């Protein structure tokens, strides 16, 4: 299954299981673009090619009364290794994505990698607390 097919499955799950939850999926992230299209997309995204694939715009209270403003998910297809045996990120691109996720967490969002549909579903269900 491609990353773009995974995004579609996760979006379908959200629409079915949590119909009132607002979310945005970056459909273009898994699609091969021409050099011109890629350049235009990069300019439109502020030069940030490591932006997460999905955002769930549902704030929630955490322990100690802190608000988490929403959930960003960087989706990876099944079988993707995020790290090497040494603990380093597997690729430069994954390292860039991890940096963006860290920066989003610092700003009050939950931000995680999810490898495969089951991991994404579990992350979403845990974040939304089973509300539908």
Q: For each predicted feature, which ranges?
A:
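Catalytic phosphate/metal-binding cores of nucleic-acid and nucleotide-processing enzymes, i.e., regions
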Residues: 1-132
């Amino acid at each position: 299954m491609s990353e773009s097919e995974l995004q579609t499955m996760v979006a379908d799950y959200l629409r079915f299981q949590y119909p009132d939850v607002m979310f945005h999926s970056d459909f273009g992230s898994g699609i091969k673009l021409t050099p011109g299209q890629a350049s235009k997309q990069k300019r439109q995204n502020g030069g940030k090619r490591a932006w997460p694939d999905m955002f769930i715009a549902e704030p929630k209270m955490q322990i100690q009364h802190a608000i988490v403003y929403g959930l960003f998910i960087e989706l990876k297809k099944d079988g993707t290794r995020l790290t090497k045996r040494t603990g380093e990120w597997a690729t430069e691109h994954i390292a860039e994505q991890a940096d963006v996720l860290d920066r989003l967490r610092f700003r009050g969002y939950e931000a995680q990698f999810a490898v495969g549909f089951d991991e994404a579903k579990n992350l979403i269900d845990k974040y939304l607390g089973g509300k539908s």
